[in-house]
């Protein structure tokens, strides 16, 4: 999925205003959760989401949905990543 496709998906699913972000290789986010449903697309590079039941690797074009209260962390892949996300 490219940026235009992600934006179209956010609009079709009545999501909030999207936010883009990126990180360098190996950057990590500690385990946390959100009160709202997060929809996230990886646009460039890769990122691994660490969920309670499994690790989910997103490469460019990948999507992950994180329902409210889903505990997760993440580690950015070796080439960094660029992502876009919104709340649903």
Task: Kindly label every feature range from the protein language model.
Residues 15, 25-26, 44-47:
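Short, charged/polar surface micro-motifs in flexible loops or helix N-caps
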Residues 25, 35, 54, 70-71, ...:
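A generic "binding-loop/recognition-motif" signal
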Residues 33-49:
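Short, conserved beta-strand element in jelly-roll/cupin
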Residues 17-34, 68:
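Conserved short histidine dyad/triad with adjacent acidic residue
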Residues 7, 28-34, 50-51, 75-76:
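Short histidine-centered beta-strand/loop micro-motifs
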Residues 68-88:
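Ligand-binding loop in jelly-roll beta-barrel domains
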Residues 53-68:
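Short acidic-glycine-tyrosine-enriched beta hairpin
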